[in-house]
């Protein structure tokens, strides 16, 4: 038995020695290759684990050497709180996984900034590698993604400190505060923003992360982690980087899309297009090249050339080697961020064509911008920005207005794209403005999706709005009226309603149609310049169209006296003017409401008072009897010249146009506005004392106040005035009946005369035999009937001719 044990032990030792001998491989290699990973999913089987370890190889190191390195490496276990934080980062903090690449490139840019700063005082800082670049390489075969920078690199201690510890202090306190904030439904962005953990976004897409780094003050080291623990060891290959860091991601199976070149290129252009340092992606392209032909191919081609003259020329000339065109796939580094951030340059140094080219590239538009502004803001927060007004309004500009995010302002921090998912960067009414904002002062939270200090964002917003309004104001008048106002006029009106702090600036940008010109629009400044002497109010009339507004009874006397009236023809117009208390010291007057008064002499005043006294019986009769419960009061009008009467709203009531808009909105939402305070207010009934109908009514009621015809006429006038004043009738049937009664009286027809009864036709009697015959031979019966009808018609025609 003992001999068998000894024999078995010898066999094991011989086998082990054979394996070690077979595994010895040369250590030399290049920096371009790094890790690989098996597709096996299970890690419980020893064979699977072995195959996986053999697949993961560092450049120049075989599987056994990798295992030996891992055994010798110093391992660090994440604490329980750090593990919780890691899970929080991976599972909840990031809104989309693709930002891992943005974070890695951003960190690479920071490292390059540091070494460039060091090189200003240390001339040997760049001796290991003079180029400052970021390079990205996809390895589909090994399921690897490499991000390499030639930045400052990290020492062993820095790898442990920077990559091994998420929260540099107060990890438990941070988690407790975050838990409390989540329970209270509060934002955790301010807490998260204190911890720079963008590197760990790599675990969103990777099962394992390996960092190879070389610092000028230390040897090259390898850091490795699977998000549960990490290890650090000196790189046995020596200095293969020169200086800098390579981050290698062993991608998860579901993240394989990030090995596609198009995906990586699009992400670089989306997030890191304006990084200060060049970013290269290892890309392939097909090129047509000329290669020398094989001897057999060349001989065959010469044989095919049978032209004797060509043959003679060839003998005379020096023989050239035969070549052929071949398509080859060529791999090389492709520059991704060739568009330089022109907002970082002084505006005086940027040509107009550069702004236009940048706008087209940035916005994906084919037209030039209508206007642009380039500025640097300083103060509480410093930032650079370029803003553009597009030539035409974006499609669906007012779809889901206010609830839909505006993605036309892109926020950058140190040339790194952060987000365009903002509700607060610009106010809703400026949702058409496109541009970029770049600041070095903005603090970011862990995912860079929201800002840590909202106060700074408000400062930026305030300056952006002011600069945008300055830009719009500088657009030439002809271009503004013909183009800008047609595309974005509604936005400016909404701004007057919504933006209290900039209301005065926005009011100067308003444009409306007016009685001054049949087609041109006018500004409020121009209206005020044309105001009559002693005119203290800006008159406006609202309607569904210009034709409706200018034919309204409310503008008759104003136009006759030469006053200019602004026509509000858009649904938002009346809201806009109501939000403006005044303009240039002049208050607005809705001519469809009370308060329209004219400057009058003493003689005119005496004449008006005499007319009011003359028509006092009619006014009292209308208020107390004919139109009782329908009107607030009846007065002699100062605004009517042609119409007999009009229905005027109180100063705080709804005009006809506003009531129509409110009812349309209520219909869409299913609300009932009949009980609304403004809708239920009674109106003032104004009469024109010079109109023949009104004068005749005065005569009639003096003779008989109970005259039914006059009572009907008063109600018809009221309902007609309701319609002409822009309001809707609650009972159109009753109105129609009264109109019919008035028509009967005008034609001397008895108002109570009945409509003649329509004679009823008796049904024809048919026998059963006839019915059966008809069913049996229907076609024949129809033909016979037709012939008989034609004969009868011919007889009648002959008889009529005889009579004539």
UniProtKB/Swiss-Prot annotation:
Locus of motif SRT pseudosubstrate motif: 42-44
Catalytic activity, reaction form: ATP + H2O = ADP + phosphate + H(+)
UniProt entry keywords in alphabetical sequence: Acetylation, ATP-binding, Calcium, Chaperone, Disulfide bond, Endoplasmic reticulum, Glycoprotein, Hydrolase, Hydroxylation, Nucleotide-binding, Phosphoprotein, Sarcoplasmic reticulum, Signal
Residues the entry annotates as binding ATP: 107, 149, 162, 199
A single MF term (Gene Ontology): ATP-dependent protein folding chaperone
EC code(s) of this entry: 3.6.4.-
PROSITE patterns reported for this sequence: ER_TARGET (PS00014), HSP90 (PS00298)
Record-listed Phosphothreonine modification sites: 786
One Gene Ontology cellular component annotation held by this UniProt entry: sarcoplasmic reticulum lumen
Post-translational modification: Phosphorylated by CK2.
Family matches, as InterPro entries: HATPase_C_sf, Heat_shock_protein_90_CS, HSP90_C, Hsp90_fam, Hsp90_N, Ribosomal_Su5_D2-typ_SF
Compartments reported by the entry: Endoplasmic reticulum lumen; Sarcoplasmic reticulum lumen; Melanosome
Annotated site location: Important for ATP hydrolysis: 448
Signal sequence extent: 1-21
Functional description taken from the UniProt entry: ATP-dependent chaperone involved in the processing of proteins in the endoplasmic reticulum, regulating their transport. Together with MESD, acts as a modulator of the Wnt pathway by promoting the folding of LRP6, a coreceptor of the canonical Wnt pathway. When associated with CNPY3, required for proper folding of Toll-like receptors. Promotes folding and trafficking of TLR4 to the cell surface.
Family, similarity comment: Belongs to the heat shock protein 90 family.
Domain remark text: The SRT pseudosubstrate motif associates with STT3A during translation in normal conditions, preventing glycosylation of facultative sites until HSP90B1 folding is completed.
Subunit (UniProt): Homodimer; disulfide-linked. Component of an EIF2 complex at least composed of CELF1/CUGBP1, CALR, CALR3, EIF2S1, EIF2S2, HSP90B1 and HSPA5. Part of a large chaperone multiprotein complex comprising DNAJB11, HSP90B1, HSPA5, HYOU, PDIA2, PDIA4, PDIA6, PPIB, SDF2L1, UGGT1 and very small amounts of ERP29, but not, or at very low levels, CALR nor CANX. Interacts with AIMP1; regulates its retention in the endoplasmic reticulum. Hyperglycosylated form interacts with OS9; promoting its degradation by the endoplasmic reticulum associated degradation (ERAD). Interacts with CNPY3.
Name of the protein in question: Endoplasmin
Lineage: Eukaryota, Metazoa, Chordata, Craniata, Vertebrata
Gene name per UniProt: HSP90B1
């Amino acid at each position: 038995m003992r001999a068998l044990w000894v024999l078995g032990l010898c066999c094991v030792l011989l086998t082990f020695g054979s394996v070690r001998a077979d595994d010895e491989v040369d250590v030399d290699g290049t920096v371009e290759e790094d890790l690989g990973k098996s597709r096996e999913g299970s890690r419980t089987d020893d064979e699977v684990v072995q195959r996986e370890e053999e697949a993961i190889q560092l450049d120049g190191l075989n599987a056994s050497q990798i295992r030996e390195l891992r055994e010798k490496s110093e391992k660090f276990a994440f604490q329980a709180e750090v593990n919780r934080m890691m899970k929080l980062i991976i599972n909840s903090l990031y809104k989309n996984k693709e930002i891992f690449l943005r974070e890695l490139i951003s960190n690479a840019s920071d490292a390059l900034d540091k070494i460039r700063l060091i090189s200003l005082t240390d001339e040997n800082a760049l001796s290991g590698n003079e180029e400052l670049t970021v390079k990205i390489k996809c390895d589909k075969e090994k399921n690897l993604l490499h991000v390499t920078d030639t930045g400052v690199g990290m020492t062993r201690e820095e790898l442990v400190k920077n990559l091994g510890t998420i929260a540099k202090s107060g990890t438990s306190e941070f988690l407790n505060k975050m838990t409390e904030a989540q329970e209270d439904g509060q934002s955790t962005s301010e807490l998260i923003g204190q911890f720079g953990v963008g590197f760990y976004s790599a675990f969103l897409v990777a099962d394992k992360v390996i960092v190879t780094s070389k610092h000028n003050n230390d040897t090259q080291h390898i850091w490795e982690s699977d998000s549960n623990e990490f290890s650090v060891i000196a790189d046995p290959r020596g200095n293969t980087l020169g200086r800098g860091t390579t981050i290698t991601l062993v991608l998860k199976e579901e993240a394989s899309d990030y090995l596609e070149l198009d995906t990586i290129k699009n992400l670089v252009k989306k997030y890191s297009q304006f990084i200060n340092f060049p970013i290269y992606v290892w890309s392939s392209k097909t090129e047509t090249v000329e290669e020398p032909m094989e001897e057999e191919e060349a001989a065959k081609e010469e044989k095919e050339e049978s032209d004797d003259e060509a043959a003679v020329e060839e003998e005379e000339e020096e023989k050239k080697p035969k070549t052929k065109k071949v398509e080859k796939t060529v791999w090389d580094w492709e520059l991704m961020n060739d568009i330089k951030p022109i907002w970082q340059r002084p505006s005086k140094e940027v040509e107009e064509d550069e702004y236009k080219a940048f706008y087209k590239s940035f916005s994906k538009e084919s037209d030039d911008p209508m206007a642009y502004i380039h500025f640097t803001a300083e103060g509480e927060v410093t930032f650079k920005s370029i803003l553009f007004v597009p030539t035409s309004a974006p499609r669906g500009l007012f779809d889901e207005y206010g609830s839909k995010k505006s993605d036309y302002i892109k926020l950058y921090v140190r040339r790194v794209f952060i987000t365009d998912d903002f509700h607060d960067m610009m106010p809703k009414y400026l949702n058409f403005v496109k541009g970029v904002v770049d600041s070095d002062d903005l603090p970011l939270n862990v995912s860079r999706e929201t800002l840590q200090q909202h106060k700074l964002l408000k400062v930026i917003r305030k300056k952006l709005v002011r600069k945008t309004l300055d830009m719009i104001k500088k657009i030439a008048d002809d271009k503004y009226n013909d183009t800008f106002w047609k595309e974005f006029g509604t936005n400016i009106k909404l701004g007057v309603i919504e933006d209290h702090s900039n209301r005065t600036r926005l009011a100067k940008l308003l444009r409306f149609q007016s009685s001054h010109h049949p087609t041109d629009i006018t500004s409020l400044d121009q209206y005020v310049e044309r105001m009559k002497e002693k005119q203290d109010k800006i008159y406006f009339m609202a309607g569904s169209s210009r034709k409706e507004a200018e034919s309204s009874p409310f503008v008759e006397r104003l136009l006759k006296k030469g006053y200019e009236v602004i026509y509000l023809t858009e649904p938002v117009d009346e809201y806009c003017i109501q939000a403006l208390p005044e303009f240039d010291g002049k208050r607005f007057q809705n001519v469809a409401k009370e308060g329209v008064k004219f400057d009058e002499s003493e003689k005119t005043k005496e004449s008006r008072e005499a007319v009011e006294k003359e028509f006092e019986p009619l006014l009292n009769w209308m208020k107390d009897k004919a139109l009782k419960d329908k009107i607030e009061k009846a007065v002699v009008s100062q605004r009517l010249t042609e119409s007999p009467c009009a229905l005027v709203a109180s100063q705080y009531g709804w005009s006809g146009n506003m009531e129509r808009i409110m009812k349309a909105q209520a219909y869409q939402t299913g609300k009932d506005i009949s009980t609304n305070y403004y809708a239920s207010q009674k109106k003032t009934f104004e009469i024109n004392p010079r109109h023949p109908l009104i004068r005749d009514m005065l005569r009639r009621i003096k003779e008989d106040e109970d005259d039914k015809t006059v009572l009907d006429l008063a109600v018809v006038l009221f309902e007609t005035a309701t319609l002409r004043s822009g309001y809707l009738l609650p009972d159109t049937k009753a109105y129609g009946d009264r109109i019919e009664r008035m028509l009967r009286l005008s034609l001397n027809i008895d108002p109570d005369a009945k409509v003649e009864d329509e004679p009823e036709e008796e049904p024809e009697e048919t026998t059963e035999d006839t019915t059966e015959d008809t069913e049996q031979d229907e076609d024949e019966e129809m033909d016979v009937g037709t012939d008989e009808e034609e004969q009868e018609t011919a007889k009648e025609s002959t008889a009529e001719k005889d009579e004539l």
